[in-house]
Regions:
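Short flexible coil/turn linkers enriched for glycine and charged/polar residues
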Residues: 12-13, 72-74, 115-117, 127-130, ...
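Charged, surface-exposed helical/loop "interaction arms" that form contiguous linear patches used
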Residues: 355, 359, 369-372, 425-426, ...
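Conserved catalytic alpha/beta cores of large enzymes that bind or transform nucleotide phosphates
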Residues: 161, 166-174, 180, 195, ...
Length: 859
């Protein structure tokens, strides 16, 4: 047996091998040591010849899913080695083979998956400066593919990875030359990475694989060789690990990168689209506010919409019109919501059905979901909007599938499919006949017992059963002399003897044969039903997709109706004009407390950049985030929290909000900040929306202000970028840019001050702030009064150009320039010479920033 184990393990070196022995999956040697640690199992041993004892641990086969899930969640692969023949019928060693390799990206079991999230596996391949990229969720059958070209391909690639957030990544080709990619995956994604050999991406082989899988759709990708290569490599990997066909994956969704708004990792994190930055919880995120879906399919699609805002006006308007129709019809909206609540996860149910792992309970769940389809169809029959009409036409009532399952499968079937009890009486005449014989067994045995008592005259004769001897006749010792010669003794006990007769063995054969025939017949009937349902995959899949879309639209309509959201005017202009905008998440968290609304007016002509000044804690960051969130909501087709809104299509949103040391990569707060700013400057376009919060605060005052101004100038200049920008800063000196730069306007957070007390009014008003109110904010934060008083004294001295050194009693000169270390050491300094040779009037903002760094390095 151990030789068999070694042979199979040799072929699966990169996996933890679950080796079936009886009722357990056993692990040996290093696998056992690893599993015992990760799963907290007792490590034992097994003799394996030549005085060697192999480390061993195991888990019961009937409860293995939980253990496998824990290993896969930690990034391990698990190879399932099953007994492929009945041990009772085996001649010699039981045959065993790998039936499946479970990896983080190939999980299908519902108990191992989050119903609200897709579980993607990704494959990427690069050749000739072109990247092929695909994502597949094997549990739902979804497959997305794209091709990335151009100088910004790395940025596009990481944005795609962020949006799909795969659990497992397969890479090959020139992708390995992207040195920063492994760092990104390790820091930003919870995904395992596997390098595939070059031959896995062989174009001719991959072409054959893709053609065989998608005969009718191959033409959509045939001219994109890198896409064909990643699809072929991924499909081959899935076949190798799943040991089965991939009938569930029957459609390629090819998309272009310019179909969706670009959202990089920092933007998705800073806007807290699906989880909060601090706790990583759903509560407090935009998804938490918008996701009132009733089905698992809807929950996954809602998340996908948030991560892929649209750029197509028609598609956006179609979604909006559907939401508007439901908002305006309360009764329809409530009825649809209630009906959706009864629909199970059709997508993942169908995956288990197609791959033959579904049990009778899964079929009943599908039946229960289908039962609601006629009502949903009837509710939508008179809808007017294009989107709801499309959904209505896409919903197949599947009445034949419902009738089949409902007539065949009992209401509450057992979990297992190999012990009978699944098929309804009346569904199959042969089964009813066999089951009748089996159910009458007690009556038959009672009659035999009565007959034998009459024949023998033994009053306490009994007919019983055990697994060893089958049916037997039991006679107590006091009546042994009355036993007929036709009785064959089988067992002697202390107080009785047990016998069999030929007639009893014949009856036993009929009874036990009926049980076996019944179980086998039930399984065959169940399997026929399952296959019939599987054969209707495309019909059911199309309906499931329609239900998911209806669920998301209805959820957004419910949120809009409950929170007084309005339909924004999304158009092709360059304007973002919102009246009385509110932050949807903050408003939801405040519950009954009022949220102070604010306006915004940006466009590419006269109002490109809004400089926002004001004290910390006053609401600058909240305001900027809410504008970005409202734009994003508008482009997924949602209504928005405002009294009116005009949104010109934005191709990307970039955010630079807050920073912290990146200890893992050895980057300081300032380095992280500058890296993010560099990414924005490199990848933003004139159609982007930029949210820049406190640029330059991670370094000294002069350096920080210089960098902030340079970035501001670059964003405002239409020849260089000209993007719509919200620019919050504590450098009040930058407010002068309103007079110096075209398209720049000043705004501040209104503050009401009475004596030493301040009140943040949370209103955005025109003009720059005249005070940072830092000491007042410190007071609000709970800084001790003694520290506050001392701070006021120091501030007063600084404002008069003085600072009293109490230890040395030295008073500095009244020269405000001395409050910062001079960049210029002396008249002979090389810094002076460098400055003399520089024409500052011709410097670009970025050149000025580079010069600043050079000067700093010369000091």
């Amino acid at each position: 047996m151990m030789q068999q184990y070694f042979k199979i393990k040799e072929e699966n070196k990169d996996s933890i091998l679950f080796f079936r022995l009886g009722d357990f999956y056993e692990m040996f040697y290093d696998d056992a040591k690893l599993a015992s640690k990760e799963l907290e199992l007792t490590l034992t041993g097994r003799d394996c010849g030549q005085a060697e004892r192999a480390p061993m641990c195991g888990v019961p086969f009937h409860s293995c899913e939980g253990y496998i899930a824990r290993l896969v969640a930690k990034g391990y692969k698990v190879a399932i080695c099953e007994q492929t023949e009945d041990p009772a019928k085996a001649k010699g060693l039981v045959k065993r083979d790998i039936i499946r390799v479970i990896t983080p990206g190939t999980v299908m079991e519902s108990s191992m998956l989050d119903e609200s999230k897709n579980n993607y596996i990704c494959c990427m391949y690069s050749k000739n400066k072109s990247i092929g990229l695909c994502f597949c969720d094997i549990s739902t059958g979804e497959l997305y593919a794209t091709e990335i070209r151009g100088n910004d391909s790395y940025n596009v690639l990481t944005n795609q990875l962020t949006s799909y957030n795969p659990r497992e990544i397969l890479i090959g080709g020139d992708i390995v030359k992207l040195k920063e990619l492994p760092k990104f995956i390790k820091a930003k994604l919870s995904a395992g990475v596997e390098m595939l050999e070059d031959e896995k991406f062989d174009e001719s082989v991959c072409t054959d694989v893709v053609k065989s899988q998608f005969a009718d759709e191959y033409s959509t990708v045939s001219d994109k060789s890198v896409v064909v290569c990643v699809l072929g490599a991924l499909l081959s990997y899935l076949r190798d690990t799943q040991k089965t066909g991939l009938e569930r994956i029957n459609h390629i969704e090819f998309y272009k990168e310019n179909q969706y708004m670009s959202l990089d990792y920092n933007t998705q994190r800073n806007l807290e689209l699906t989880q909060t930055m601090l706790t990583k919880d759903k509560k407090g995120s935009l998804l938490w506010v918008l996701d009132k879906t009733k089905t698992a399919m809807g929950k996954r699609l809602m998340r996908s919409w948030l991560e892929h805002p649209l750029l197509n006006i028609t598609s956006i308007n179609n979604r909006q019109s559907a939401i508007e129709e439901l908002v305006n019809d309360n009764m329809l909206r409530m009825d649809v919501t209630d009906t959706l609540s009864g629909i199970f996860d059709i997508e993942r149910l169908m995956t288990r059905i197609v791959y033959g792992s579904a049990n009778a309970r899964d079929l009943r769940s599908l039946c229960g979901a289908i039962q609601n389809l006629p009502q949903i169809s009837d509710l939508l029959v008179d809808c007017k909007s294009v989107y709801l009409k499309y959904i209505y036409k896409s919903i197949d009532k599947l009445e034949d599938i419902y009738s089949l399952i409902d007539s065949a499968i009992v209401e509450e079937p057992p979990f297992t499919v190999r012990e009978g009890g699944m098929i309804k009486r009346g569904y199959n005449e042969e089964l009813d006949s066999v089951t009748g014989d089996m159910n009458d067994s007690k009556g038959i045995l009672a009659r035999i017992e009565a007959e034998q008592r009459d024949i023998t005259g033994i009053p306490k004769l009994k007919v019983g059963y055990n697994r060893v001897f089958g049916y037997y006749i039991e006679v107590s010792n006091s009546y042994k002399s009355m036993v007929p010669e036709t009785y064959i003794r089988k067992q002697t006990l202390t107080n009785c003897e047990r016998y069999i007769t030929q007639d009893l063995k014949d009856v036993e054969g009929r009874i036990l044969g009926a049980k076996d025939r019944s179980v086998a017949l039930e399984y065959n009937l169940f399997d026929d039903v399952r296959k019939t349902v599987s054969d209707n995959l495309e019909r059911i899949q199309k309906t499931a997709k329609a239900i998911a879309n209806l669920d998301v639209i209805t959820s957004l309509a419910n949120v809009a109706a409950d929170n007084r959201y309005i339909r924004p005017d999304v158009n092709l202009s360059t304007a973002i004009r919102i009246k009385d905008s509110r932050h949807p998440v903050v408003e939801a968290l405040l519950k009954d407390a009022p949220f102070v609304p604010n306006d915004v007016s940006l466009d590419s002509a006269n109002d490109r950049v809004a400089i926002i000044t004001g004290p910390n804690m006053a609401g600058k960051s909240t305001y900027m985030r809410q504008i970005a969130i409202i734009v994003l909501m508008a482009q997924i087709g949602s209504f928005v929290p405002a009294s009116s809104a005009e949104i010109g299509i934005v191709d990307s949103i970039f955010t630079r909000v807050g920073a912290s040391d990146d200890l893992a990569s050895g980057q300081s707060t300032f380095m992280v900040e500058m890296s993010e700013v560099a990414n924005i400057i490199k990848n933003a376009t004139s159609k982007s929306l930029l949210i820049l919060d406190e640029i330059g605060r991670g370094t000294s005052t002069f350096d920080g202000m210089s960098i902030a101004r340079a970035v501001l100038e670059f964003c405002a200049d239409r020849k260089k970028l000209g993007a719509k920008t919200l620019f919050a800063t504590h450098y009040h000196e930058l407010t002068v840019m309103e007079q110096l730069l075209d398209g720049v306007k000043n705004y501040n957070i209104a503050v009401k001050k009475r004596g030493d007390d301040i009140t943040f009014l949370r209103r955005i008003v025109p003009g720059g702030a005249d005070d940072s109110y830092g000491i007042e904010v410190a007071k609000l934060a709970g800084i001790p009064q003694s520290v506050i008083s001392r701070a006021k004294e120091i501030l007063k001295d600084l404002e008069h150009g003085k600072y009293k050194n109490e230890n040395a009693n030295i008073q500095k000169q009244d020269n405000s320039d001395d409050m910062q270390l001079s960049l210029i050491g002396s008249a002979e300094s090389p810094v002076i010479e460098k400055l003399k040779d520089t024409d500052i009037n011709t410097l670009t903002p970025i050149e000025a920033m580079n010069l600043l760094y050079e000067l700093k390095g010369m000091i």
